[in-house]
Each structure stands twice: as C-alpha cells, then as structure tokens.
Amino acid sequence: MFKLKTKSGAKKRFKFIVNGKIKRKKSFKNHLLTKKENKRKRRLSYFSRVHKSDIKNIKKQLLLN
C-alpha cells in the first residue's frame, strides 16, 4: 500500500482558525500594483475565510477527513 500525501500547494495556502474555519490570503496582490489604489492594496493584504462549500475539498486535499 502506498502512502497518502497532502497536496503541498494546499498546505502552503491555507491555515486553520481555532473555531474550525480556514483562512486564506486574497488574490491580486502579486504584481501590477502601481495602478491599484492604496486602499485596495491594504484590503487585499488582509486574510479572508474560505467559503463553507469549499471546506470539504480543502480538508480532503490536506487529508483531514
């Protein structure tokens, strides 16, 4: 039998919060930042929660069923 391995991309992108929810970084903050407003860049730097319909798939990728 082979070993089950976690998806390394998911391992780097998601972190768990105490109440069982998952947090993630927002997208659109990597490049082409000169034409974006400071307010928008500041909002994009905050963490966001993963939607409840996606939690099952993320736990599956992290082998947490």
From Swiss-Prot:
<dbReference type="InterPro" id="IPR037229">
    <property type="entry name" value="Ribosomal_bL35_sf"/>
</dbReference>
<dbReference type="GO" id="GO:0006412">
    <property type="term" value="P:translation"/>
</dbReference>
<dbReference type="GO" id="GO:0022625">
    <property type="term" value="C:cytosolic large ribosomal subunit"/>
</dbReference>
<comment type="similarity">
    <text>Belongs to the bacterial ribosomal protein bL35 family.</text>
</comment>
<dbReference type="InterPro" id="IPR018265">
    <property type="entry name" value="Ribosomal_bL35_CS"/>
</dbReference>
<dbReference type="InterPro" id="IPR021137">
    <property type="entry name" value="Ribosomal_bL35-like"/>
</dbReference>
<dbReference type="Pfam" id="PF01632">
    <property type="entry name" value="Ribosomal_L35p"/>
</dbReference>
<dbReference type="InterPro" id="IPR001706">
    <property type="entry name" value="Ribosomal_bL35"/>
</dbReference>
<keyword id="KW-0687">Ribonucleoprotein</keyword>
<dbReference type="GO" id="GO:0003735">
    <property type="term" value="F:structural constituent of ribosome"/>
</dbReference>
<protein>
    <recommendedName>
        <fullName>Large ribosomal subunit protein bL35</fullName>
    </recommendedName>
</protein>
<keyword id="KW-0689">Ribosomal protein</keyword>
